[in-house]
Design a protein with these regions (language model features):
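Amphipathic alpha-helical packing segments from all-alpha helical-bundle domains
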Residues: 62, 67, 99-109, 119-144, ...
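Hydrophobic alpha-helical bundle segments that form small-molecule/ligand-binding pockets
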Residues: 73-81, 115-123, 130-157, 171, ...
Length: 216
């Protein structure tokens, strides 16, 4: 790798280990084996390098999630049951990889808190939003993100991004209190007015008994 790639790799490592706010230019130099002058030469500034490293790290998480998904879709149960099962299965994997990449997500949260005072960082997050929404729909629906239309990206992608944002905050406070994928599905069921799921309602219903034939 050249110095540019080394710097990006080093900055990503610093985001994971030290976080957004605590990473210094010297930390990046130490992690990359490059030199201070090369940061300005290749990226213009340490802040620009950090922005690129943050979004590259989030892209790495998305790639990791995508690789972890099983190719097979849930079979049987009708379309609604399929959607619920697929969401629960895939969101469970998302949560598992949240934990694996939690250093990056903590860094993202730190960065978000800085956007009010950093117009360039704010603009970078703004540019990433449409692509992020589209990518989340593609991952969780099991389709190529190029097939996700604008309306679906706006409605469903925004919903998924809201879930992700909430998970980032919850993880920062207390990871043990994060709701499971099943909890989220159950919450959505109740919001839509469905009865709470119990062991009886979640079980496969028994076939009705045959009607009695009246005696002749």
């Amino acid at each position: 790798m050249g110095h540019r790639e080394d710097l990006l790799t080093g900055a990503k490592r610093c985001l994971e280990e030290k976080g957004w706010s605590r990473t210094t230019a010297r930390d990046i130099v130490a992690a990359s084996g490059a030199n201070l002058a090369s940061i300005g030469y290749h990226y213009g500034s340490k802040d620009a390098l950090m922005r690129e490293a943050l979004f590259a790290s989030m892209s790495d998480w998305a790639d990791d999630v995508q690789r972890s998904f099983e190719a097979d879709e849930p079979a049987g149960g009708g379309r609604d049951a399929e959607l619920r099962e697929r969401f629960e299965t895939r969101w469970t994997r998302v949560l598992e990889l949240f934990d694996k990449h939690q250093g990056v997500w903590r860094s993202q949260l730190e960065a978000i808190l800085q956007v009010r005072h950093d117009p360039e960082l704010r603009a970078a997050f703004g540019r990433a939003q449409p692509e992020g929404r589209q990518g989340l729909v593609g991952m969780l629906h099991g389709v190529d993100e190029s097939e996700v239309d604008e309306e679906t990206s706006r409605v469903m992608g925004s919903f998924y991004m809201t879930l992700v944002s909430g998970m980032i905050v919850q993880m920062a406070i207390d990871p043990d209190l994060m709701p499971s994928a099943h909890d989220l599905v159950e919450a959505m069921r109740r919001i839509l007015g469905e009865a709470p799921e119990t062991s009886e309602t979640s079980a496969t219903p028994e076939a009705p008994a045959a009607p009695e034939v009246p005696a002749s």
